[in-house]
Amino acid sequence: MAGGVTSGSAEGWSKRFEEGLHPVIERFNASISFDITLLQEDLDGSIAHARMLGECGVISLEEAAQLEGGLEKIRSEAAAGEFQPGLVDEDVHFAVERRLIALLGPVGKKLHTGRSRNDQVGTDLRLWLRRRLDDLDCELERFQHALLTQAESHRQTLIPGYTHLQRAQPLCLAHHLLAYIEMIQRDRDRLKDVRGRVNISPLGAAALAGTSVPIDRQNTAAALGFECIYANSLDAVSDRDFAVEYTAAASLVMVHLSRLAEEVIFWASEEFAFVRLSDRCATGSSLMPQKKNPDVPELVRGKCGRVFGHLQGLLTMIKGLPLAYNKDFQEDKEALFDTVRTTKDCVEAMSILMEEGLEFCSERLAAAVESDFSNATDVADYLVAKGVPFREAYQLVGAVVKRCLDEGILLCDLSLEQWQEFHSAIAEDLHEALAPKRVVAVRISEGGTGFDRVEEQLRHWRSRLDSVLS
């Protein structure tokens, strides 16, 4: 493209450039197709910057008002579908500036005074992520409510507890669901911590060294709701720690969702049959008419990989970058945008699954906890209470279990005489101690699955979650 700069994406560059970009390079270089996501935040940041320039006397108050009016006009055009940036704009920042100049003429060219796209994009990204963090927290709270409602419906329902995916000890189903509420609360706490480091303003750091223009960074930070400003301009435009931290925290959210999803998939299988999936949250087979597939938890489990991949991608992208800004940073947007969208979608889907997508099969669960050896530990505890050393009791119960397995019976099938062949301290009250509900009820340690302890936790979480709503 000889004869001067003709590429639209080069219009914001200096006259050092005599030729426009090669069309392929122009497409390769542009980010407008995805960073248009930041339009509202770009307008918010630009309005705060324009007001500050006016208040500091860098431009007149009248010019600042004109700039704000033009930016709000662009917002209105975008809402009406009339603002249509293209490849010619390269990115959202140039798109806004180009339209502003078209609306205001020379005054529009004053907006970028004392600012670089380097601090501008950092500001936009933080504003955008801050809002999405708040949205995600609301979704996670909804998920906790859904889990709690299910738990409250199953105060007395038992479910086998597993270690190594082998039957271990019976649990109160509410206790099992409460465990996920605890996990999600840790996620919410982590994300709140991340939000604190997102909420720092880089605006005014300019390209990397600050600016000679007499701006007021505290002014724009306060106007945009940031807690403080970056103390070092070089760090301000170089930092993407917050994006990594968010993606790491989101990865843990996905881990917790995936663990529950995995359990639901098992529970919904005919081999377990612990839950029934509703028609609204399951799919069928194109070939096998009897199938009802757990697609929701399977997709949640599968989508973990893309979030984990984004975390690895961000770390790999940042690790070798010299200070300050590098074009590599353009690669943070799609990773971050997709992580936010995927995580929120998965939390929402799992909330719906818990709210209306599955029903626990109480009869099947009751039969499951009555047909195994998950009460074996209670025999050992019974013997310990009779004065038998634990390790001796442990070995003795192992021998009893072996005999039962050899004979194809359960512990509850042994007569008192058969029990006493193993130890004379065993009395008639052992059979009561082996009842599944008794096994659960006696787990009275703080945080345990005993019904009284579970009631305490149900009341705690109901009070805690309801207090947020009131």
Swiss-Prot record:
Pfam assignment, any one: ASL_C2
SUPFAM superfamilies: L-aspartase-like
EC class of the enzyme, as a word: lyase
GO cellular component, one term: cytosol
PROSITE patterns in the cross-refs: FUMARATE_LYASES
Primary localization class, coarse: cytoplasm
Top-rank lineage group of the source organism: Bacteria
Entry keyword annotation includes Cytoplasm: yes
GO molecular function annotations of the record: argininosuccinate lyase activity
Known EC number: 4.3.2.1
UniProt KW GTP-binding keyword: no
Record's keyword terms, sorted: Amino-acid biosynthesis, Arginine biosynthesis, Cytoplasm, Lyase
Location in or out of the cell: Cytoplasm
GO annotation terms (biological process): arginine biosynthetic process via ornithine; L-arginine biosynthetic process
Catalytically driven reaction(s): 2-(N(omega)-L-arginino)succinate = fumarate + L-arginine
Pathway: Amino-acid biosynthesis; L-arginine biosynthesis; L-arginine from L-ornithine and carbamoyl phosphate: step 3/3
Family: Belongs to the lyase 1 family. Argininosuccinate lyase subfamily.
Protein name: Argininosuccinate lyase
Phylogenetic placement of the source organism: Bacteria, Bacillati, Cyanobacteriota, Cyanophyceae, Synechococcales
